[in-house]
Amino acid sequence: IVMKHLEQRVGEEDFRKGMREYLSRYAYSNADWNDLVHILDELEPSDLRVWSDVWVEQPGRPTISLQREGDGQPGIVLQQTDPWSRDRVWPQRLEVAFLSDSESDAPRLLHRAQVELRGASVEVPIPAAARDAKTVFVIPNSGGVEYGLFEPDPASLSFLVERHAQLEDPLLRGVAWLTLWDAMLEDRLPPETLLSAAVLSIETEPAEQLVSRILTDVTQTYWRFLTESQRRRWSGVLEDAVWSAVEASETRTRRAEFFTTYIELASSREAVARIGRIWSGEEDVPGLSLSQRDRIAMARVLALHEAPGWRQILDAQASKIRNPDRLAEFDYLRDSLDADPEIRRAFFESLRDPANRHREPWVLQGLANIHHPLRAPAAIPLVLPALEMLEEIQKTGDIFFPAGWLAATLGGHNSPEVVEIVSAFLAARPDYPPRLAGKILQASDMVERAARISL
């Protein structure tokens, strides 16, 4: 996205010239972002260093809100604010889509306007093509490359909730979904409303990339942003919608993705029982041949839910695994799935020995099992020890291991208690390595949001 905005700022031809010069000048040496900015600024002086400082060097993103002008003023205002209160401005070109709705037809795209947002705000007139519409709805980031937290006006947000799935342009549908997701994360849209919107898309969305994103967000919303009573209300609705999509899918890839989501979402007695029947071979998944990894995933879920005979299910699954590496992984993870919290704690304590962290993907899966939302309350006492081990994890593991360790540890939690543990850990260590502190803040961001929203 940054490169696209850089190209827009200097122009396509100068951008190409600059890239050629950059690659030629530094073909056999080291170069960084600032070297590219310097070359482009020489070609087309336009305060690129100031632009780069805000866009690249400093953290944060703008909040861009859409406001309707008063009666008799046919237009909208796009207001840009700096959430860090530093009065920064992110100059960029926005593509603003104007749409109308109809009860009998799909929403109609009336006009796309190119808008230059150079300061704190910009007024955008309602285009002539939209003035006869009874109600005009606006998507301020319809180009797909705009950067920021975009906040539509209430009418447009409601329109996206109810009608995003009927938008003809797949890019607009994708932008609409991301806008709804951001609205939920910012507590402007209730999680249950987001799930209602998702149900409209699950069966009908033809774009596989967008389906994948929606299913990921649905799973996270269900497990982290709903209260237990809300999950009980929504379990059957989501399970039925996803299973219907399994049956209706026309491609194996699509069917497999829906079935994977069904396994991850299953929490009602009926859904867990169905997974048990599929695992045992009593029931088939229409049009889908299950792999051994699928059956291992089902056995894992049955153990997490402590389904009747879960120990025997794990024993039976182990007896069917012929690949020695896969069997070793399965055996390694057994204790992380146990119903006894003390056995799970012992698994965690074993990770203090570097020899038991040799297979890092196995370690991360074990932590994810321990901290699964179903087991999260019992796992809270293990959060602080995991944070205390982080510096050693960085020294003894792969470069990506610390981020994975944190994601697996915090990924199932949504309680204020865990938020407080993380905050107290960092507050007590003012000299903690900045990179690791940043990773902790990044991993805990969703915990904080979920704790606040799901209260």
Please tell me what each predicted stretch does.
Residues L48-R49, R61-I139:
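Beta-strand-rich binding/interaction modules
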Residues R86-R88, L99, A106-L109, P125-L455:
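Long, ordered, helix-rich scaffold segments
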Residues E57-Q58, V96, P152:
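Generic structural "secondary-structure junction" signal
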Residues I1-V77, P190-E208:
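Amphipathic alpha-helical substructures
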